């Protein structure tokens, strides 16, 4: 019922928005609750309205908008250098012309497996003045606090919840969404770069045998495991499902003054893209 109400708010607001051309304000589709929980339905309704009236610009409200995958556009995508899957997309632009998304300094804070922007068959599009980040990274990491023959003891911060399932390590978020991993890479905690001569451990099963220690830490098990105590072990995401910007068959797209701090794939990927620049 709650999600239906959120979607209804966006549809009702469309009746209040401009009816032809000009600027459209996302605020007309939002209320305080949706901005703080899931602005996705409002964004979806606003973009649909913009396409229908051929608006020149969608202006975001500033501040922070939280966006979830629950009611986002669904689309199965094959994206070069990323992994195919059924995507959830926040800003889905198809066939739009001469259109701008003015972020107005807005921070878009995403939760879960969702792609921020997808543009298909679009021309003369500008996205400007916004920030993209995620509440949880797609990789996971923890500090190496002890080691031995064929094992490492890892202390994970609260940001990276984990448990043991069938004798193997599993990462999840507070809602239970699982974050698979497929490789381990040791990072120098001081220099904040891959450790000198670190081994890149690939995991064909997308997990690793593990056991929980009495102190709450996790001991991961593999014959050839080694690392320096005090360094950080990064558990790399198993797939690139959610690029920041996907541009397919587009012409003249400008991304200006955008801070992309994190995403679940490549930052910007262009397929069959042309530009006069």
Residue locations for each model-derived region?
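Bacterial N-terminal signal peptides
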Residues: 2-12
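Bacterial Sec-dependent signal peptides at the C-terminal "C-region" and cleavage site
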Residues: 12-22
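Acidic Gly/Asp/Thr-rich repetitive segments characteristic of extracellular carbohydrate-active
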Residues: 26-58
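Extracellular beta-strand-rich solenoid/capping regions of secreted or surface-exposed proteins
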Residues: 44-51, 66-100, 109-128, 136-157, ...
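Tight coil/turn sites that cap or link beta-strands
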Residues: 62-63
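Acidic/polar low-complexity surface segments
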Residues: 69-85, 91, 136-241
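Conserved small/polar residues in nucleotide/adenosyl-binding loops
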Residues: 273-277
């Amino acid at each position: 019922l709650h999600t239906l109400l959120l979607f209804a708010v966006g549809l009702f607001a469309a009746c209040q928005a401009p009816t032809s051309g000009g600027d459209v304000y996302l605020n007309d589709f939002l209320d305080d609750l949706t901005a703080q929980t899931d602005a996705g339905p409002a964004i979806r309704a606003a973009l649909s309205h913009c396409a229908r009236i051929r608006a020149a610009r969608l202006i975001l409200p500033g501040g922070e908008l939280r966006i979830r995958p629950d009611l986002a556009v669904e689309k199965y995508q094959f994206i070069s250098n990323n992994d195919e899957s059924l995507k959830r997309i926040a800003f889905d632009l198809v066939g739009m012309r001469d259109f701008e998304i003015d972020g107005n300094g807005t921070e878009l804070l995403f939760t879960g497996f969702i792609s921020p922007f997808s543009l298909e068959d679009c021309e003369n599009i500008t996205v400007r003045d916004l920030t993209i980040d995620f509440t949880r990274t797609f990789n996971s990491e923890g500090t190496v606090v002890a080691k031995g023959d064929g094992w490492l003891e890892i202390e994970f911060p609260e940001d990276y919840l984990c448990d043991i399932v069938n004798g193997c390590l599993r990462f999840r978020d507070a809602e239970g969404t699982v974050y698979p991993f497929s490789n381990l890479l040791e990072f120098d905690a001081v220099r904040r770069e891959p450790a000198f001569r670190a081994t890149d451990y690939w995991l064909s099963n997308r997990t690793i045998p593990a056991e929980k220690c009495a102190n709450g830490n996790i001991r991961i098990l593999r014959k050839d495991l080694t690392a320096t105590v005090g360094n950080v072990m990064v558990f790399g995401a198993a797939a690139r499902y959610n690029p920041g910007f996907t541009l397919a068959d587009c012409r003249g797209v400008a991304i200006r003054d955008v801070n992309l701090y994190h995403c679940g794939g490549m930052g910007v990927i262009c397929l069959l893209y042309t530009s006069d620049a």
